[in-house]
A protein has these predicted regions:
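Aromatic-rich peripheral "rim/lid" segments of glycoside hydrolase catalytic domains that contact
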Residues: 16, 45, 113, 117-118, ...
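Noncatalytic carbohydrate-binding groove/subsite architecture in carbohydrate-active enzymes
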Residues: 71, 86-91, 129-278, 282
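Solvent-exposed serine/threonine-rich low-complexity stretches and specific carbohydrate-binding patches
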Residues: 396-407, 444
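Boundary/entry segment of secreted carbohydrate-active catalytic domains
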Residues: 1-36
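Short strand-edge motifs at loop-to-beta-strand transitions and within beta-strands
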Residues: 408-412
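Surface-exposed, short loops/turns at beta-strand junctions within beta-sandwich domains
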Residues: 414-421
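Substrate-binding cleft and catalytic face of glycoside hydrolase catalytic domains
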Residues: 24-170, 208, 316
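Short beta-strand elements
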Residues: 436-449
Length: 449
């Protein structure tokens, strides 16, 4: 699972500057970053300046082993791509991005098309949904354009806000994710399309405010979809896309924005401007860290989820914006950085929490060296408990048990083996927290000199 951050601070004019910002993300434990690229009407290709900036991002990410997700979006509701010409331009622009940046595999199409800030109109004059059918047409066109560049590209649709009013007469017309996905599915069926429109769903599962714990943010009786509403989301996807060429209940899910705002301590207050909206309800840093850990645990246990992206790594300066980062605006670390980094590490190692029904199978490698003394080097992709057995023919010559940390080589002494004899070494591996069947590794047979 990707555990990353939505953070445009890595968009820098030089590689050196981009690398400094990317290093900060790695310090927090993230293995992915989502950045945005704005499309404007009439554009069909990248400017030289934007291409240089994005190549710096991609190069810095490669140096740090970070995966890049690229959101292609219009800026605000005045540039919504509503006509066939605008959709063609948008799709050509996305394809140009993919051609210029072949290292980028993941593309998110649009941003929160279910709310009026990013997409208008939301409703037709008769009160029916105008946004979902128009977005479906854009997503289909972008999907085809990106796949024409490379079939390996993963197109993520939606990037949906978790809330919405579903009231065409509201002064702020919006759609709930439930209504928007329902209407998106209806538009897809009406198109008679025989190909998918997305390879995964992007969703922004924010809670009602920052004081709500992710594990408590369940909405069985409303149209909101937050982190703990996974079962509701999967059921909805199965309903709206079932029986079509578009995957529904098995569609991969990417939570590409989730944030909890933290209170700014007095010692850092002078770094910030503006006033915090009363509706935000920021929490102490320790609570922010605990909530981010809950978010990681929830996503880790949800079978279709492939990614969780926090919003942001670094605070925004304006208190009317987002102070949801793990670093203050001056790039110094918040007190909960270590807690969140540990949760991310444990998720990558498969031990962040126990999940009912989850059965992990460690994968790894086993190499034996005979000098200076016989020893095996075991490397597991996730944490593993191991039983290493040395055999000479059918006889067990040595056996050792232990636990290895995922991604870290474990050296295991093989006991006193006799010179001139041939041996075979095997390792039986199991996941310590969410065990499935054992994985058995076999090293190349060897002789002790």
């Amino acid at each position: 699972m990707l555990i990353g951050v939505a953070e445009d601070s890595v968009r820098r004019p030089t590689l050196a500057e981009a690398k400094v910002e990317m290093d900060l993300l790695v310090q927090a434990g993230f293995n992915a970053v989502r950045v945005t690229q704005i499309w404007a009407p009439g554009e069909t290709k990248l400017s030289a300046a934007d291409q240089r900036i994005l190549r710096n991002v991609v190069q810095a990410a490669r140096l740090d082993g970070v995966q890049v997700l690229l959101t292609v979006m219009n800026f605000g509701n005045r540039t919504t791509p509503l006509t066939e010409q605008r959709r063609e331009e948008f799709a050509a622009y996305a394809a140009a991005l993919a051609s210029a940046l072949p290292q980028v595999r993941y593309f998110v199409i649009g941003n929160e098309p279910n709310i009026n800030r990013y997409w208008l109109p939301q409703f037709s004059p008769d009160g029916t949904d105008a946004a979902a059918p128009a977005y479906e047409a854009l997503l289909a066109r972008a999907y085809d354009a990106l796949n024409a560049v490379s079939s390996k590209i993963v197109v993520l649709g939606g990037a949906i806000s978790p809330h919405g009013g579903d009231d065409p007469d509201s002064i702020r017309p919006t759609h709930s994710p439930t209504a928007f996905l329902t209407d998106l599915g209806a538009a897809y069926r009406a198109s008679s399309r025989t190909k998918p429109i997305m390879d995964g769903l992007a969703l922004h599962p924010y809670e009602d405010n920052s004081s709500v714990a992710p594990i408590d943010g369940v909405h069985p009786n409303s149209t909101t979809i937050a982190l703990a509403d996974y079962d509701k989301l999967v059921t909805l996807l199965g309903t709206v896309f079932g029986g079509t060429a578009q995957r529904g209940s098995t569609l991969p899910i990417y939570y590409d924005e989730f944030g909890v705002e933290a209170q700014i301590p007095p010692a850092k207050a002078s770094l910030y401007t503006g006033r915090e909206p009363v509706t935000v309800k920021p929490v102490p840093e320790a609570v922010q860290g605990a909530y981010y850990r809950q978010a990681v645990e929830l996503a880790f246990c949800q079978p279709n989820v492939r990614g969780l992206f926090l919003f942001h790594a670094i605070d925004e300066r304006d208190l009317n914006r987002w102070q949801s980062g793990l670093f203050y605006i001056d790039r110094s670390a918040k007190s909960d950085l270590r807690l969140v980094r540990a949760a991310i590490s444990q998720a990558h190692r498969g031990v962040v929490t126990h999940c009912p029904g989850l059965a992990l199978l460690p994968r790894g490698s086993l190499v034996v060296a005979v000098r200076p003394v016989p020893q095996a080097t075991l490397l597991c992709d996730i944490d593993c408990t191991y039983v290493v057995t040395v055999r000479r023919g059918s006889r067990v010559a040595d056996r050792s048990r232990g636990r290895a940390v995922g991604g870290q080589a474990k050296r295991i002494r093989l006991g006193l083996l006799r010179s001139g004899l041939h041996y075979m070494v095997t390792a039986s591996l199991s996941a310590p927290v969410n065990p499935g069947h054992a994985t058995v590794l076999r090293a190349v047979p060897f002789a002790v000199p």
